[in-house]
From Swiss-Prot:
The protein's enzyme class: oxidoreductase
Residue numbers binding NADP(+): 35
Top-level taxon in the UniProt lineage: Bacteria
Organism of derivation: Haemophilus ducreyi (strain 35000HP / ATCC 700724)
Reactions it catalyzes: (S)-2,3,4,5-tetrahydrodipicolinate + NAD(+) + H2O = (2S,4S)-4-hydroxy-2,3,4,5-tetrahydrodipicolinate + NADH + H(+); (S)-2,3,4,5-tetrahydrodipicolinate + NADP(+) + H2O = (2S,4S)-4-hydroxy-2,3,4,5-tetrahydrodipicolinate + NADPH + H(+)
Biological pathway: Amino-acid biosynthesis; L-lysine biosynthesis via DAP pathway; (S)-tetrahydrodipicolinate from L-aspartate: step 4/4
Protein's name according to its UniProt entry: 4-hydroxy-tetrahydrodipicolinate reductase
CDD domains according to UniProt: DHDPR_N
Matching PROSITE patterns: DAPB (PS01298)
GO term, biological process aspect, one: lysine biosynthetic process via diaminopimelate
UniProt GO molecular function: 4-hydroxy-tetrahydrodipicolinate reductase; NAD binding; NADP binding; oxidoreductase activity, acting on CH or CH2 groups, NAD or NADP as acceptor
Amino acid sequence: MLRIAIVGAGGRMGRNLIQAVQQTEGLSLMAAFEREGSSLIGTDVGELVGISPLGITISACLAEKTADFDVLIDFTRPEATLEYLKFCLANDKKIVIGTTGFDENGKQAIKQASQKIAIVFASNYSVGVNLVFKLLEKAAKVMGNYCDIEIIEAHHKHKVDAPSGTALSMGEHIAKTLGRDLKTDAVFERYGIMDERQTNQIGFATIRAGDIVGEHSVWFVDEGERVEISHKATSRMTFAKGAVCAAQWLANQPQGLFDMTNVLALDQL
């Protein structure tokens, strides 16, 4: 039985993760955490998600549960994730990271930690989105050098980072396939009078509105035609199930930094 702990348990993703773990054979939810001072501290996680009590209450202290779990699943914020990462590193725990919005220092900290512990770090845990990454690589090989490429993403109004980590990953997959650097090719803002678009640019557009779970569309545009590769998520359970799948896969891995390409064996396609 693989023992799971969840941080950010009271959030939208956290609640879906609790349900996903409970629905998955071979997994046992052993601990759930929220930030210090949260009104949810002491709440039974079963009652939190509308099922029967599970006898597991939300805590603020990981140290109290060190011996209780094998893999930590984290969908919080970068500053919190890096603290949880330090805990996992100090206690030889594996971690699935779904947090996005890290700066270069944060990404480097994750990379360094992976030299000692096993980590799955992905911008999106949807199976469909990760399949889209592969499709984008195929499209970029055929059309990327002569088409204009634009990435449009939409999320709920509470999402704080933009563009989404998934949109950036899409751009990175395309740029890498073309032998280019996204840092120099990306255009994140267009306003007012500006120079004519350059073919090497990869444009990003962001929408934040209502309760949109997550939508991404990539356009490859040439004179007279446009190819669109799109993905729409209608439930966060899609991401939760993917993260749980990643935790199961991670249980059999030594130290190292992995993503959903590894988990789903997409390189074999």
